[in-house]
């Protein structure tokens, strides 16, 4: 009896139950993993999507800001008062306006300036203004060059040697009133004048014949000086009363 009882106990083997994870097929595992990855992607993409929607400003507000920037494209830095005015027009906060201008100066402003340079109408106007300015400057410089000659211009003229009569201060006779003198001058032989090439700073050489006319004048001067010296000597020799 004991042997018979032991026999069935030995023949019965315990049945092992597999866990649910082990009983699932590989296809089910793949679908679960892909589903988990998709859920994770949705969670990660959700904040970015919200952020993009938050950064988009209304089209009317952007147009107002772009118009202001185009008018002030050479100095696109609005002051606090101007920011307040734009905030009232666009219904945006001051922070949004400041951020928009920071980004617009890097992305939009260069295109605005380049578009203005490439515009043929604006370039034609600029060329006309430059041509008009050049004409005005040319007209202003013409009177200065062709103005009346002043004393400075007269002094800058070259000095030519004057005739002998004009150098001594004599009055030249009228050729019409004295025809006989004119004939006499024509009949007289021309004097030879020696011309020497010298530097402008050195005085012109004068022939000794020109000094002959002043000999009598020099004698009178010497006589007057001598007479004055004699009178002075006589005054010194006279005794005091």
UniProtKB/Swiss-Prot annotation:
Locate the DNA-binding region by residue range: 48-111
Described by its record, this protein's role is as follows: May have a transcription role in testis.
Membrane spanning segments where? none
* Record keywords, A-Z: DNA-binding, Homeobox, Nucleus, Transcription, Transcription regulation
From the Swiss-Prot or TrEMBL record, state where the protein is found.
Nucleus
Q: Which segments show compositional bias classed as Polar residues?
A: 21-39
Please give the chief subcellular localization of this protein. nucleus
- What's an example Gene Ontology biological process for this entry? negative regulation of transcription by RNA polymerase II
User: Which SMART domains does the entry mention?
Assistant: HOX
Instruction: Show the InterPro entries listed in the entry.
Output: HD, Homeodomain-like_sf, KN_HD, TALE_homeobox
Location of region: Disordered? 1-58, 126-209
What Pfam families does the record point to? Homeobox_KN
Q: Which organism is it from?
A: Gorilla gorilla gorilla (Western lowland gorilla)
- What is this protein identified as? Homeobox protein TGIF2LX
Q: Keyword check for rRNA processing, yes or no.
A: no
Question: CDD domains, per this entry?
Answer: homeodomain
């Amino acid at each position: 009896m004991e042997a018979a009882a032991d026999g069935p106990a030995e023949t019965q083997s315990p049945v092992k139950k597999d866990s649910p994870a082990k009983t699932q097929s590989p296809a089910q595992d793949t679908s679960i993993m892909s589903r988990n990855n998709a859920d994770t992607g949705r969670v990660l993409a959700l904040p970015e999507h919200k952020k993009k929607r938050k950064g988009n400003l209304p089209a009317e507000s952007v147009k107002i800001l772009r118009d202001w920037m185009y008018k002030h494209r050479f100095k696109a830095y609005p002051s606090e008062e101007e920011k307040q005015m734009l905030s009232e027009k666009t219904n945006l906060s001051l922070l949004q306006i400041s951020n928009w201008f920071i980004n617009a100066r890097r992305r939009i402003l260069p295109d605005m300036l380049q578009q203005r340079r490439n515009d043929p109408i604006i370039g034609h106007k600029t060329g006309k203004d430059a041509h008009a300015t050049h004409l005005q400057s040319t007209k202003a410089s013409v009177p200065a060059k062709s103005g009346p000659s002043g004393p400075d211009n007269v002094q800058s003229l070259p000095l030519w040697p004057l005739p002998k009569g004009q150098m001594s201060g004599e009055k030249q006779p009228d050729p019409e009133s004295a025809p006989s003198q004119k004939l006499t001058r024509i009949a007289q032989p021309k004097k030879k004048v020696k011309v020497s090439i010298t530097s402008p700073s050195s005085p012109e050489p004068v022939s000794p014949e020109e000094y002959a006319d002043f000999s009598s004048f020099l004698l009178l001067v010497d006589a007057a000086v001598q007479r004055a010296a004699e009178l002075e000597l006589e005054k010194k020799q006279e005794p005091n009363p």
